[in-house]
Amino acid sequence: MPKRGKNYSNKSQSFDKQQVYTLEEAVGHVLATSYAKFDETFDIAIKLGVDPRHADQMIRSSVVLPHGTGKVTRVLVFAKGAKEAEAREAGADFVGGDDLVEKIQGGWLEFDKTVATPDMMGTVGKIGRVLGPRNLMPNAKLGTVTFDVAKVIEEIKSGKVDFKVEKAGILHAGIGKISFGNEKLTANALAFIEKIIQLKPSSSKGVYLKSVTISSTMGPGVKVDPVYLRALVKK
């Protein structure tokens, strides 16, 4: 965890940390309390009324943010033949099969996302123990095991964010950069929240969207009113 000093303390006192705000107000406070000398990531943390220990309440998916993430994502694609050519043309950073498997087995991991055509999963399985713990394994639920490689590469490059609910129903993601400004960050946050609400399991009872907090990498968390968000998404 980053070390926090006087700047964090001073900034966190510029708003009421116990109050909940509209999304636009909360983003404004995050921008006002950002003090780092680098372009901080805009983070969102959501507490959901689900129990991920139950398979039917495990939420794992992805969303393409309207303004991207601000990060350069290196995409590796396992494909052959025409699909290999398609992946290269679509802008994949690395494309191959057994050659990439051998390279990864040797310790090379200079990529951020992986995609595989279904016929390559037998090959990819050889390095499952390497990719799996690092959340780099192609996954059909996330759309990264597909023959439509060009579409997926485009989505990843344009700002596709994968997410998964963790213990205690907590879900978090980086959904932009502070330099984006209020309008773009608000739009990204709303798109992310809309996706989460769409994924509500039928077995989830009671309040689903319990709390939402946004922050910059080094800044204090700002609470967003979940009631306001639910009403906003329904409009």
Curated annotation (Swiss-Prot):
GO term, biological process aspect, one: regulation of translation
One Pfam family matching this protein: Ribosomal_L1
GO MF annotation, one: rRNA binding
Keyword Repressor: yes
Keyword Membrane in annotation: no
Any Gene Ontology CC annotation: large ribosomal subunit
Keywords, comma-separated and alphabetical: Repressor, Ribonucleoprotein, Ribosomal protein, RNA-binding, rRNA-binding, Translation regulation, tRNA-binding
NCBIfam families reported for this sequence: rplA_bact
Family listed: Belongs to the universal ribosomal protein uL1 family.
Assembly description: Part of the 50S ribosomal subunit.
PANTHER family given in the database record: 54S RIBOSOMAL PROTEIN L1, MITOCHONDRIAL, LARGE RIBOSOMAL SUBUNIT PROTEIN UL1M
Task performed by this protein: Binds directly to 23S rRNA. The L1 stalk is quite mobile in the ribosome, and is involved in E site tRNA release. Protein L1 is also a translational repressor protein, it controls the translation of the L11 operon by binding to its mRNA.
Name assigned to this protein: Large ribosomal subunit protein uL1
Organism: Desulfotalea psychrophila (strain LSv54 / DSM 12343)
Lineage per the UniProt record: Bacteria, Pseudomonadati, Thermodesulfobacteriota, Desulfobulbia, Desulfobulbales
